[in-house]
Swiss-Prot record:
Pathway: One-carbon metabolism; tetrahydrofolate interconversion
Purpose: Catalyzes the oxidation of 5,10-methylenetetrahydrofolate to 5,10-methenyltetrahydrofolate and then the hydrolysis of 5,10-methenyltetrahydrofolate to 10-formyltetrahydrofolate.
Gene Ontology CC entries for this record: cytosol
Gene Ontology molecular function terms on file: methenyltetrahydrofolate cyclohydrolase activity; methylenetetrahydrofolate dehydrogenase (NADP+) activity
Protein name: Bifunctional protein FolD
Taxonomic lineage from the root: Bacteria, Pseudomonadati, Pseudomonadota, Betaproteobacteria, Nitrosomonadales
Annotated positions binding NADP(+): 165-167, 190, 231
Reactions mediated catalytically: (6R)-5,10-methylene-5,6,7,8-tetrahydrofolate + NADP(+) = (6R)-5,10-methenyltetrahydrofolate + NADPH; (6R)-5,10-methenyltetrahydrofolate + H2O = (6R)-10-formyltetrahydrofolate + H(+)
């Protein structure tokens, strides 16, 4: 058998059309949604990600502002920029591109973002609300994964999902979202002893370990759904995920490719969250309140 390929690119294209309509309505009846992206330093990968986000904003009709700071920016200056954006009524979403320079206290920076503009879903209040199933915004990558699973009608209720990776960005929120849908969730890391004993029992495997080709075909059960969040660059310059794609696709039931899998959905979910933030701000403004942010 050969797995059905879950194309994030195709699903993202479908969502983009829906998002364009929502942006059009907002722009015609209120104001253009606005996203601010803060970049500190010249990390090549971060620069590429920020350009891709700006390009997607332009395609959808979202106003984007990129604040590109040198790598030696002070904590105080960075926090002041965030506070300025928090009270800017034309900015509805604020994203701080990670990683930040080593001298910056990341937790303090993320916590400074107004909750109603935290379109990455990383603010401590949003993370806490995610535990109860009432997050204002869902972190973009796991949110995109959930949309992909839903698009292909992959059942979650009662299914055993194994996540490899425990990051605050993917692994932990992914576990909470799957739990919310009734899955039985096991969280592992790349250092979990006898990792294969866990993955072989999984109906769904989500790879987010950041280790190239970690999951091989002998580590999954026949027909399993395999979601590859990892993106790694090999010595020859090629991109690959955490899954040994050519072998695993011959045994899995569903699988995401790298590139063209989860990546496009992450950006689309960021756009969705930005539009949602603008829609909420509009509702508050029309009700006679201040539409800038929720502090």
């Amino acid at each position: 058998m050969s797995a059905t390929i879950i194309s994030g690119s195709l699903i993202a294209s479908k969502f983009r059309e829906e998002l364009k309509q929502r942006v059009k309505i907002l722009s015609e009846t209120w104001m253009q949604p606005g996203l601010a992206v803060i970049l500190a330093g010249d990390n090549p990968a971060s620069c590429v990600y920020v350009r891709n986000k700006a390009k997607t904003c332009e395609e959808l009709g979202i106003r984007s502002e990129i604040f590109n700071f040198p790598g030696d920016i002070s904590q105080k200056a960075l926090l002041q920029q965030i506070q300025d954006l928090n009270v800017n009524p034309e900015i509805h979403g604020i994203l701080v591109q990670l990683p930040l320079p080593g001298h910056i206290r990341i937790d303090e920076v993320i916590a400074a973002i107004a909750i109603g503009k935290d379109v990455d879903g990383f603010h401590p209040c949003n993370v806490g609300a995610l535990v109860t199933g009432h997050a204002l915004f869902h972190p973009c990558t796991p949110f995109g994964v959930m949309k992909m699973l839903a698009e292909y009608d992959i059942p979650l209720q009662g299914q055993h999902a194994v996540i490899i990776g425990r990051s605050n960005i993917v692994g932990k929120p992914m576990a909470l979202m799957l739990l919310e849908k009734g899955a039985t969730v096991t969280v592992c890391t790349s250092r979990t002893r006898d990792l294969a004993s866990h993955t072989r029992n999984a109906d769904i495997v989500v790879m987010a370990a950041g280790k190239a080709n970690l999951l091989t075909s002998d580590m999954i059960r026949t027909g399993a759904t395999v979601i590859d969040v990892g993106i790694n660059r090999l010595a020859d310059g090629r991109l690959c995920g955490d899954v040994e794609f050519s072998g695993v696709k011959e045994k899995a039931g569903y699988i995401t490719p790298v590139p063209g899998g989860v990546g496009p959905m992450t950006i689309v979910m960021l756009m969705n969250n930005t539009i949602e933030a603008a829609e909420r701000a509009k509702a508050v403004a029309l009700a006679g309140g201040w539409h800038s942010s929720v502090q």
